[in-house]
């Protein structure tokens, strides 16, 4: 039996609640399949599109005197509940359908960051909708947002993405796992908080990369494998070119060379690779699998996906 952290990509979860629910139902079958094979899993998820849409909608309401503006920490908490609810419900239904009595819990999770992290001066985490160049430039002029081109898919707003330091609810996660509970935690990389005097915490405007928090979670609970599910089947070098090549198996040293060659796009694949390296360096016996949500079953059979080891 292996202990596995499964990190679901926010972009792979669809663009609407309806699309997300449909995708999540299919994902639940694959995740429950891992459980029936005897594996112990913990689930995390991204929230880039979702938290951006929540923030955009609430800000629109505030600008039209229909409600207050909400900080990003609160928007992150909302996205954890929204995505976690759909995952939790789908997993509960799938477990019930096969006669398995197992509790599923979504844990609102805070993650400590450093308020002096240089990321706060260099926004890099894409969130929200995709825009063409003209739309992005217009919004940037009107609202002062920062936009970047995102892996050939269009332009997206970027926000600070500080490094995760510690998971505040870690002991609660461990307790739930020990009691045979299927845990959904660290959604969207966790709600970013900074430490104040007397060990208090306060939310801060940022979005933590979910793969980096998932790697931290995996190392903290000493899991055997980190599975990162995204929108593509493999990690590629020369991505989106005529000579792009999938990496089927690779290692930390090779990935570091590819990083030096700027093979991985900032804000999309690069954080996943950095998370994989971090996980393996903190857990040398572990491995990382990166593939698409749709190909999870095939990837678990070794037919597709990128496997990373030390």
Swiss-Prot record:
Protein name (database record): Carbamate kinase 1
GO biological process: arginine deiminase pathway
Family the entry assigns: Belongs to the carbamate kinase family.
SUPFAM superfamilies for this protein: Carbamate kinase-like (SSF53633)
GO cellular component: cytosol
Pathway the protein contributes to: Metabolic intermediate metabolism; carbamoyl phosphate degradation; CO(2) and NH(3) from carbamoyl phosphate: step 1/1
NCBIfam families per record: arcC, PRK12352.1
Segments passing through the bilayer: none
Sorted UniProt keywords: Arginine metabolism, ATP-binding, Cytoplasm, Kinase, Nucleotide-binding, Transferase
Subcellular location, record wording: Cytoplasm
Domain of life of the organism encoding this protein: Bacteria
Keyword Transferase: yes
Gene: arcC1
Enzyme category, top tier: transferase
Keyword Protein biosynthesis: no
EC number of this enzyme: 2.7.2.2
Chief subcellular location: cytoplasm
Gene Ontology molecular function terms on file: ATP binding; carbamate kinase activity
Catalysis performed (reactions): hydrogencarbonate + NH4(+) + ATP = carbamoyl phosphate + ADP + H2O + H(+)
Origin species: Staphylococcus aureus (strain MRSA252)
């Amino acid at each position: 039996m292996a202990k596995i952290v499964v990190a679901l990509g926010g972009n792979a979860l669809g663009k609407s609640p309806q699309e997300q629910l449909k995708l999540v139902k299919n994902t639940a079958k694959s995740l429950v399949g891992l459980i029936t094979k005897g594996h112990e899993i913990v689930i995390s998820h991204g929230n880039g599109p979702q938290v951006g849409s929540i923030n955009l909608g609430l800000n629109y309401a505030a600008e039209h005197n229909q409600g207050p503006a909400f900080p990003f920490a609160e928007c992150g908490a909302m996205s954890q509940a929204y995505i976690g609810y759909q995952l939790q419900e789908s997993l509960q239904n799938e477990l019930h359908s096969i006669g398995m009595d197992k509790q599923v819990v979504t844990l609102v999770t805070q993650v400590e960051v450093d308020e002096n992290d240089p990321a706060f001066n260099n926004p890099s985490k894409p969130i929200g909708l995709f825009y063409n160049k003209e739309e992005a430039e217009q919004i940037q002029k009107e609202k002062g947002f920062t936009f970047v081109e995102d892996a050939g898919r269009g332009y997206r707003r970027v926000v600070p993405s500080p490094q995760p330091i510690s998971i505040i609810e870690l002991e609660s996660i461990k307790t739930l796992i020990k009691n045979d509970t299927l845990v959904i935690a660290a959604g969207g990389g966790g709600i970013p908080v900074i430490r104040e005097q007397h060990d208090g915490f306060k939310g801060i405007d940022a979005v933590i990369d979910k793969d980096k928090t998932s790697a931290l979670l995996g190392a903290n609970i000493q899991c055997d494998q980190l599975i990162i599910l995204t929108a593509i089947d493999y990690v590629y070098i020369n991505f989106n070119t005529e000579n792009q090549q999938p990496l089927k198996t690779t290692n930390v040293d090779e990935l570091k060379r590819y990083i030096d060659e700027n093979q991985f796009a900032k804000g999309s694949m690069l954080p996943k690779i950095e998370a994989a390296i971090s996980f393996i360096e903190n857990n040398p016996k572990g491995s990382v699998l990166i593939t698409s949500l749709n190909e999870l079953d095939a990837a678990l059979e070794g037919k597709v996906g990128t496997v990373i080891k030390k």
